[in-house]
C-alpha cells in the first residue's frame, strides 16, 4: 500500500504536536503546537485520500518517467501562490505605514506583519522558486532522475511546513528579533533537517549524472544550498529556555551578535537572492532565446569571484556602529570589489541574446528576463556605492535602503522568477503555449512600472530623510524633530503603496494566466507585433 510510511510519520508527528500543546511551558508555544497539529493532520487526511489499496501491477503503475517533474509542478504552483500572498501582505504593510490606523492589534500590527511580508517574498516565493527550478534544471543538465525517490516530496512539503510555522509564529509574536532569521529554535531545527534533505537530493542527482560536464547553473545552485546551510546553522545557534517553550537565547551577544547577524543577513542576499537566481539566469535565458551562454569562461570567473568576495561584505550593514573600524572598512572594500564580477555576470546574461535581440521586442518572456538582468546590474552597482562610508552616512537607516532592496528583490528576483515560470508551465503541463502571451506583456509593464514607481519614490524619500536628520541651525540644534521627518514621508508612502499595488496586479494576472494554462485553455488573440503567429486554439 502506497504512502503507508508517510501516513505513519505524519500521524506520529501530529500526536507529538498534540502532546507538545498539552505540556507547553508557555501559551505561545502551545498555540504553535496546535498550528503544527492541524497542519500535520491535514497532511495525513490528504494522503489517505490518495492511498490505493489495490495491489501494484508489475510494470504498469510502478513504471517511472525519465524525470521526476511532479514535485516541480507543485513547486511552481506554490511559487505563484506564495508570491501573491507575499506581495499582498507587502501592500498592506505599505498602507499601514501611510495610514497607521490600519494597524490591528495585536496580531496584525506592523511589527508582526512586516516580517511576514519579507519572509513570504524571500523564503516562500523565492525559496519555492529556487527549489522547483533547481530540481528541474539539475535533472535536465545531468540527464538523470532526481535522486532519492520521494525525498523530493519530503523537501517540498517539509519546506511548506516551515513556511506555515514561520508565518503563524510571526503573527503570534514568536520571534528571535533577528532580521530574515525570525523563527524560533524549533522551527530552525526543522528547516535544517529539510535543507540537508535538499542538499542530498540535489547532490545525489549530480553524482549519478549521465552527462559528464556539470553545467554552470548547477554550480550556482550548489553554492546557494551549501552556503545557506552554513549561514543558517551558525546564525541560529541558540539555547532554548525550555524544550517545551518558544523562547531561546542566542549563543552570541553584543557586537559579536550583530556581526554574526549581518554576516548571515547580507549573505542571505548574496547566496539566496543572488547565487540561486543567477543559476536561473544561466539556464532559462539561453533556453528561452535558444542561444548558448555568451561566454562560458566568464560564467566560471563570475562564479568564483562571487563565492570568494560576497561572504566578506556583511559588515557594511554596520557602518558607524560599535563594530571595529577595520571590520567596517573590510566590508566596504569587498563590497566595492563585488561590482566588477557582478557586472560581468550581467553582461554575460545580456550578451547571450547576441543574434536574437529582436526577441526583446517580440517575446515578452525574454523581455521580462532581460529587464531582470538590468535590475540586477543596477542593484549591484547601487549596493557597492551605498557601502562607501561617505554615502552610507546619508543613506543608512533611511528609505533609500528600502528602495535599493526592492529594486533588487522585485526587479531582479521577481522578474527572473516570473520569466522562469512562464517558461516552465507550458512544458511541465504539455501545453503548446501559455493561455495568453499578451497577458505576459501586460504583466511585464505592470511589474516594471510598479518597481520603478516604488524604487524611485523610496530613493527620493530616503535622501530627503537623510538630509532632514542631519540639518542643524546656527546654534547647533537639530532643525527637524524626528516626528516632523516621519510626517514628511506621508506622500511618498502613499505612492509606494501604489507602486506595490501595480506589482501585485501583475502577479495576479500571472496567477490567472498560469491557472488557465494548467487547465488547458488557450486565448484566441492576435500575436504581438513582429512575432510569429500564435497557434490557433484547439476546437
From Swiss-Prot:
Q: Where does it live in the cell?
A: Cell membrane
A single GO CC term for this protein reads: plasma membrane
Report the superkingdom from the record.
Bacteria
An example of a GO molecular function for this protein is: metal ion binding
EC number(s) per entry: 7.1.1.9
Residues at which heme b 2; high-spin binds? 404
One of its GO biological process terms is: oxidative phosphorylation
Q: Which cofactor does it need?
A: Cu(2+); heme b
UniProt keyword Phosphoprotein present = no
Q: Which UniProt keywords apply?
A: Cell membrane, Copper, Electron transport, Heme, Iron, Membrane, Metal-binding, Plasmid, Respiratory chain, Translocase, Transmembrane, Transmembrane helix, Transport
In the record's cofactor note, how is the cofactor described as bound? Answer: Binds 1 copper ion per subunit, denoted as copper B. Binds 2 heme b groups per subunit, denoted as high- and low-spin.
Membrane-crossing ranges are: 4-24, 28-48, 75-95, 118-138, 154-174, 187-207, 214-234, 265-285, 298-318, 330-350, 368-388, 405-425, 443-463, 475-495, 499-519
- Principal EC category: translocase
Pathway connected to this protein: Energy metabolism; oxidative phosphorylation
Q: Report membrane topology.
A: Multi-pass membrane protein
Q: Give the main location.
A: membrane
Function noted in UniProt: Cytochrome c oxidase is the component of the respiratory chain that catalyzes the reduction of oxygen to water. Subunits 1-3 form the functional core of the enzyme complex. Co I is the catalytic subunit of the enzyme. Electrons originating in cytochrome c or a quinol are transferred to the bimetallic center formed by a high-spin heme and copper B.
Q: Add the further remark from the entry.
A: This cytochrome oxidase is probably a cbb3-type.
Recorded family membership: Belongs to the heme-copper respiratory oxidase family.
UniProt protein name: Cytochrome c oxidase subunit 1 homolog, bacteroid
Q: Which organism is it from?
A: Rhizobium meliloti (strain 1021) (Ensifer meliloti)
Amino acid at each position: 500500500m502506497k504512502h503507508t510510511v508517510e501516513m505513519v510519520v505524519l500521524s506520529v508527528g501530529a500526536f507529538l504536536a498534540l502532546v507538545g500543546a498539552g505540556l507547553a511551558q508557555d501559551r505561545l508555544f502551545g498555540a504553535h503546537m496546535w498550528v503544527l497539529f492541524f497542519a500535520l493532520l491535514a497532511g495525513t487526511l490528504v494522503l489517505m485520500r490518495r492511498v490505493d489499496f489495490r495491489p501494484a501491477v508489475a510494470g504498469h503503475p510502478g513504471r517511472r518517467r525519465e524525470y521526476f517533474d511532479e514535485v516541480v509542478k507543485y513547486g511552481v504552483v506554490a511559487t505563484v501562490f506564495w508570491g501573491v500572498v507575499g506581495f499582498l501582505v507587502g501592500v498592506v504593510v505599505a498602507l499601514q505605514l501611510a495610514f497607521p490606523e490600519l494597524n490591528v492589534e495585536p496580531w496584525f500590527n506592523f511589527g508582526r506583519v512586516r516580517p511576514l511580508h519579507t519572509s513570504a517574498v524571500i523564503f516562500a516565493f523565492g525559496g519555492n522558486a529556487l527549489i522547483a527550478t533547481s530540481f528541474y534544471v539539475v535533472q535536465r543538465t545531468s540527464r538523470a532522475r532526481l535522486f532519492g525517490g520521494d525525498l523530493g516530496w519530503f523537501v517540498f512539503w517539509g519546506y511548506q511546513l516551515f513556511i506555515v510555522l514561520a508565518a503563524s509564529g510571526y503573527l503570534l509574536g514568536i520571534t528571535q528579533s533577528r532580521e530574515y532569521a525570525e523563527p524560533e529554535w524549533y522551527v530552525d531545527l526543522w528547516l535544517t533537517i529539510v535543507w540537508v534533505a535538499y542538499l542530498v537530493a540535489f547532490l545525489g542527482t549530480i553524482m549519478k549524472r549521465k552527462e559528464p560536464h556539470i553545467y554552470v547553473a548547477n554550480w550556482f545552485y550548489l553554492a546557494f544550498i551549501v552556503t545557506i546551510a552554513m549561514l543558517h546553522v551558525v546564525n541560529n545557534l541558540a539555547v532554548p529556555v525550555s524544550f517545551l517553550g518558544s523562547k531561546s537565547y542566542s549563543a552570541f551577544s553584543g557586537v559579536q551578535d550583530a556581526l554574526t547577524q549581518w554576516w548571515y543577513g547580507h549573505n542571505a542576499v548574496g547566496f539566496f537572492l543572488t547565487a540561486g537566481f543567477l543559476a536561473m539566469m544561466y539556464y532559462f535565458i539561453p533556453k528561452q532565446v535558444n542561444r548558448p551562454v555568451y561566454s562560458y569562461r566568464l560564467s566560471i570567473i563570475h562564479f568564483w569571484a562571487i563565492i570568494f568576495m560576497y561572504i566578506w561584505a556583511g559588515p557594511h550593514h554596520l557602518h558607524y556602529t560599535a563594530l571595529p573600524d577595520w571590520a567596517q572598512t573590510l566590508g566596504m572594500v569587498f563590497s566595492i570589489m563585488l561590482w566588477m564580477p557582478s557586472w560581468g555576470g550581467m553582461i554575460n546574461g545580456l550578451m547571450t541574446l547576441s543574434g536574437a535581440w529582436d526577441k526583446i521586442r517580440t517575446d515578452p518572456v525574454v523581455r521580462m528576463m532581460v529587464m531582470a538582468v538590468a535590475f540586477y546590474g543596477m542593484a549591484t552597482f547601487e549596493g557597492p556605492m551605498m557601502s562607501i562610508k561617505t554615502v552610507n552616512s546619508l543613506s543608512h537607516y533611511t528609505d533609500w535602503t528600502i528602495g535599493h532592496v526592492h529594486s533588487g528583490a522585485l526587479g531582479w528576483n521577481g522578474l527572473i522568477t516570473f520569466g522562469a515560470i512562464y517558461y516552465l508551465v507550458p512544458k511541465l503541463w504539455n501545453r503548446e503555449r501559455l493561455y495568453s502571451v499578451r497577458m505576459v506583456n501586460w504583466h511585464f509593464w505592470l511589474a516594471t512600472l510598479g518597481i520603478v514607481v516604488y524604487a524611485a519614490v523610496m530613493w527620493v524619500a530616503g535622501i530627503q530623510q537623510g538630509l532632514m536628520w542631519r540639518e542643524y541651525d546656527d546654534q547647533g540644534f537639530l532643525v527637524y524633530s524626528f516626528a516632523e521627518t516621519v510626517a514628511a514621508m506621508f506622500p511618498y508612502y502613499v505612492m509606494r503603496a501604489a507602486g506595490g499595488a501595480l506589482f501585485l496586479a501583475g502577479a495576479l494576472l500571472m496567477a490567472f494566466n498560469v491557472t488557465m494554462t494548467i487547465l488547458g485553455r488557450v486565448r484566441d488573440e492576435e500575436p504581438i507585433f513582429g512575432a510569429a503567429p500564435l497557434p490557433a486554439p484547439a476546437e
